[in-house]
Design a protein with these regions (language model features):
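C-terminal soluble interaction/assembly domains
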Residues: 406-427
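N-terminal secretory signal peptides that target proteins for export/translocation
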Residues: 1-11
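Processing junctions and N-termini across compartments
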Residues: 23-25, 299, 408
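Serine-dependent protease modules
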Residues: 31-344, 348-390, 400-401, 410
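Bacterial N-terminal signal peptides
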Residues: 16-27
């Protein structure tokens, strides 16, 4: 009996080893099959992405601009002076990108690419070149529209920038350093970036897709091949790519583009209030639960805000059912609504929520017939000038008090704390 027990034990051990061996083989085979499936999926996705990019590239253009510069000084005289035989003229050249947005030749790009240029030349993906006409440019948003007379154009599809998510894969296409039709891949790093100090109206999509000089005006697209942003600027200490790029959301760019095509300029809404972000201290003082919204610090006399009944201390938390996270967002919403638009504001007043309807006015840029004294602050990184009589009256300030910021240096202390061109420093 003991001998049989030993033989049975050996037999069980042999079968156990045999079964374990085949289980290991089956596991390895299954793992290999899974890896092959994953690899095939990656290859399929890669080919699909390449096909999509190839299609979208037909809508991306290379832009070359020229601007005449008159020489100044003893050796560089004004060329318009016919009595000067040594008159000389210089041409400044620049490069950028753009997206074809219609079959009849409209192209969306940046103001800093084509604004104030004497000549604009557009090169299509197939190498054809066309002289372009500047339809309109909007420096406050850095958006511009040009047009070419060409046939068989392939416009880009418009996406919805409000729907994109942080972490979503995106692709940038453009002409960095003149290298045409360059494609880079990245993700959306952040949405709603403001207080960057690049433009007056900021609501940027931030991406780590490589963007370099020459990419400006080109498209940022999603994996469906739809335009979600206009590549505009980079954050860099050396002028090159450092992983932080900014694009104007297509929803914002489209509103501006439509105004430029229809009127040649942008008509923005004006509420007539001074605003600031709600800090933790202010939230506690006003008895609100969080720092979302925009605090009204001043109501301009005879403004739409005053007419509608807004008062100092109101906290605006929604505009037409859209949540307001900060003052920059409120400013953008009011501007986008346009002149004479009826908007519904949801505000917190003394701890209670109120609904206020406002008919906006048109935001007018400050103008004056005589040059104003300009001052600069190298420490803060701002350029300011005295208030014109028109601005003093419109903003409700006393004559001779305050200055208006005309320029903010990117990355300066002023930019970091949120100062922007157009703001008034009263004290």
């Amino acid at each position: 009996m003991k001998i049989k027990t030993k033989e049975n034990t050996k037999l069980v051990a042999r079968w156990s080893i045999f079964l374990l061996f085949w289980m290991m083989i089956a596991t390895v085979a299954q793992s290999s099959e899974v890896n092959q499936t994953a690899l095939q999926n990656m290859i399929r996705d890669s080919k699909a992405r390449a096909a999509m990019v190839e299609h979208v590239r037909e809508a991306v253009v290379h832009i070359r601009v020229e601007k005449s510069l008159n020489g100044a000084g003893s050796n560089l005289q004004n060329p318009s002076n016919q009595n000067n035989p040594g008159a000389r003229q210089f041409k400044q050249q620049g490069l950028g990108s753009g997206s074809i947005v219609s079959k009849d030749g409209y192209i969306l790009t940046n103001n800093h690419v084509v604004g104030d240029s004497d000549r604009i030349v557009v090169r299509l993906h197939d190498g054809q070149e066309f002289e372009a006409e500047l339809i309109g440019a909007d420096p406050p948003s850095d958006i511009a529209v040009i047009k070419i007379a060409a046939d068989e154009l392939h416009p880009i599809q418009m996406g919805n920038s409000d729907e994109v998510k942080v972490g979503e894969t995106v692709i940038a296409i453009g002409n960095p350093f003149g290298l045409t039709q360059t494609v880079t891949l990245g993700i959306i790093s952040a949405k709603g970036r403001s207080n960057v100090g690049i433009t007056d109206y900021e609501n940027f999509i931030q991406t780590d897709a490589a963007i370099n000089p020459g990419n400006s005006g080109g498209p940022l697209i999603n994996l469906e091949g739809k335009l979600i942003g206009v590549n505009t600027a980079i954050f860099s200490k050396n002028g090159g790519y450092q992983g932080i790029g900014f694009s104007v959301p297509v929803n914002m760019a489209q509103i501006i583009m439509q105004d430029l095509i229809a009127e040649g300029k942008v008509s923005r809404g004006w509420l007539g209030v001074g605003i600031q972000d709600v800090t933790a201290e202010l939230a506690q003082a006003f008895g609100v639960k969080n720092t979302k919204g925009s605090l009204i610090t001043k109501v301009m006399p005879s403004s739409p805000a005053e007419t509608a009944g807004l008062i100092k201390g109101d906290i605006v938390i929604r505009v037409n059912q859209r949540k307001v996270k900060n003052s920059s967002q409120l400013r953008n919403y009011i501007a986008e609504a346009g002149a004479w638009a009826d908007v519904t504001l949801e505000v917190i007043r003394e701890g209670k929520t109120e609904i206020i309807k406002v008919t906006l006015d048109e935001l007018k840029s400050a103008s004056t017939s005589t040059p104003l004294k300009t001052q600069s602050s190298l420490v803060l990184g701002i350029l300011v000038q005295d208030l014109s009589p028109d601005v003093v009256k419109r903003l409700g300030y006393d004559p001779g008090t305050g200055v208006v910021i005309t320029e903010v240096e990117s990355g300066s202390p002023a930019a970091q704390v949120g100062l922007k061109a157009g703001m008034v420093i009263a004290e």
